[in-house]
Regions:
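Core SAM-dependent methyltransferase catalytic element
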Residues: 183-185, 250-259
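C-terminal helical/coil "lid" or tail adjacent to the Rossmann-like core of SAM-dependent
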Residues: 1-15, 188-244
């Protein structure tokens, strides 16, 4: 799995403030429909950007709890959200949440469940924390939707094969509705959010993935450093001549808990 250390946190911080990932975050926010006075869980809260937005939305009568297993991420989140009195951060994973039963009106997770070995446990524990009739929004990338041009397709495939080892489930969205319904809950909607980049935006998803993929492939001895660097450099070269192209879709599953 990818290690969310201080350097990774810094890379994510830049991209998460960019327009593309801000729109992605907004799509999950809109699907959740936070309302004044609600208690909301932000599961896998990362650096706290969505947590802060939720805290503003629920107001002083509401409360938001951000949960993440990474100390570096929660440190960044606490710093970002230090002015908010209606939120807190707790250490924990999606399949063992430090939350009381049926204590939250709503819960959201953005690109979290795909990294969990125990997907069934994560779904069960998240649903446990939400009140009957509450809403759960789960947003994950489908890595099968990835389109990424390269003039060296074999090298690109090596990098993608390496990257495919950093998550547990790259196809979770196609299975998630059935898993939800099997538990007696209702799927209100599945909303696609496609991110397309033909310029190699400095603050986009593609450039963030390029840095992380190069780092991950070399650190895990999946490819030689020179190969990873050549792949990285090619994408910049393609962008300079107008040939860069990247696209991937995230799916937002909106769940209504039974009861």
């Amino acid at each position: 799995l990818l290690k969310f250390d201080a350097e990774t946190t810094r890379l994510l911080e830049i991209a998460y403030q960019g327009a593309e990932l801000t729109r992605r975050r907004q799509a999950s926010f809109d699907a959740l429909c936070p309302a004044p006075g609600e208690t909301i869980l932000d599961i896998g809260c990362g650096n706290g950007m969505l947590t802060a937005e939720l805290a503003r939305a629920v107001g002083s009568d509401g409360y938001v709890i951000g949960i993440d297993p990474s100390e570096d991420m929660t440190a960044a989140a606490r710093e970002r959200c230090s002015d908010y009195a209606n939120l807190e951060f707790r250490a924990g994973a999606a399949n063992s949440l430090p939350i009381e039963d049926e204590s939250a009106d709503k819960a959201v997770s953005v690109q979290v469940i795909e990294y969990i070995d125990d997907i069934d446990g994560a779904l069960d524990d998240t649903l446990r924390c939400v009140k009957p009739g509450g809403r759960l929004v789960i947003s994950d990338l489908h890595f099968g939707s990835l389109i990424w041009f390269s003039g060296e397709p074999d090298r690109m495939q090596k990098m993608l094969t390496s990257w495919n080892q950093h998550f547990v489930s790259g196809s979770l969205p196609e299975r998630l509705p059935a898993l939800i319904k099997a538990r007696g809950n209702f799927v209100e909607d599945v909303l696609p959010f496609t991110m397309t980049d033909y310029q190699l935006k400095p603050d986009g998803l593609a450039i963030m993935m390029m840095h992380l993929m190069k780092q991950y492939a070399v650190a895990n001895d999946h490819v030689e450093p020179a190969v990873a660097q050549s792949w990285f450099d090619e994408q910049h070269s393609l962008a300079k001549v107008g040939r860069f192209f990247f696209s991937m879709t995230q799916f937002i599953v909106v769940v209504h808990k039974k009861g």
